[in-house]
């Protein structure tokens, strides 16, 4: 079903190694990198494993959607995918469960964990 397609897409996104300057890249650059297109004449090399993620990142970067279009139902669906994939849990680093993300600001945060 559609759920499986999204699940596979999200899994690939989460396992993709990122360039060292990922946090300094804007959304356009991130999408270019993830889409495999070259920008600035050279392709950035992915070397860093993603250790945290927020739903907005998955929505905008993995699915290529606009942030203002994220509905609560979409959030639940994406959170459901993270649960199904396993290996990700809500952060306990902050009381609110939110941390700051470049581009997106404070967002509910999921961190990688080894079972």
What are these regions (language model features)?
Residues 2-6:
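Short, small-residue-biased leader/transition segments that mark boundaries at the very start
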Residues 7-52:
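Positively charged, polyanion-binding regions of nucleic-acid-associated proteins
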Residues 41-115:
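Positively charged interface segments
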């Amino acid at each position: 079903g559609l759920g499986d397609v999204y699940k596979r897409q999200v899994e690939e996104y989460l396992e993709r190694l990122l360039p060292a300057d990922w946090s300094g890249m804007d959304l356009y650059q991130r999408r270019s990198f993830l889409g495999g297109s070259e920008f600035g004449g050279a392709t950035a090399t992915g070397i860093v494993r993603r250790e945290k993620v927020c739903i907005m990142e998955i929505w905008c970067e993995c699915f290529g959607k606009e942030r203002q279009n994220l509905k609560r139902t979409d959030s639940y669906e994406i959170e459901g995918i993270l649960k199904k994939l396993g290996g990700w849990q809500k952060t306990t680093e902050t009381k609110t469960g939110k941390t700051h993300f470049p581009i997106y600001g404070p967002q509910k945060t999921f961190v990688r964990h080894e079972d």
